[in-house]
Amino acid sequence: TRFFCKPNAMQCNTSFVILDPKGEIVRDIGGLLENKGYEVRVLDLINMHRSHCYNPFVYLRNDNDVQRLVTNLFKATTPKGSQSQDPFWDTAASMLLLALVFYLKYEAPPDEQNFPMVMELLRAGEVREDDDSYVSPLDELFDRLEMVNPEHIALKYYRDYHSGSAKTLKSIQITLAAR
């Protein structure tokens, strides 16, 4: 860092992407780079309030991109070497996630296309095991979508997810929230 990265960055002669896990490089030369006209951005996964953000929704161009995002998210959050005895839960959770991401991609304004909104939708999908007639705000959202566009791709995945019992749906939601 001291003899390679800092001297090269301080020459200010090109754009940089610097891995700085300790934050010492940005602390030591971030101000210099900003004074030279650089836009310094930090992705800090520990202190998110001090971090610039990454929103994968910005890069979703088509349905295949959505599928790939969900698949990669599940792969990235599965511990190495672990295998589920029953893949049903991961498959069902990915169907729910696909429904939510497709809904946001095609129906939400750009500022609501993000993972915090996915979590908000997930929380809106409250399931009551003792009341089969209960309709959650998320159910209402997809009911309205069905009235407007019964062939919507998000609706197809939501129907697949929603075909289980209340107890099963609750377990699927917990599986997804844990990811």
Language model feature labels by segment:
Residues 1-103:
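Switch/coupling segment of Walker-type NTPase motor domains
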Residues 89, 94, 98-179:
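Non-catalytic, charge-rich alpha-helical accessory subdomains
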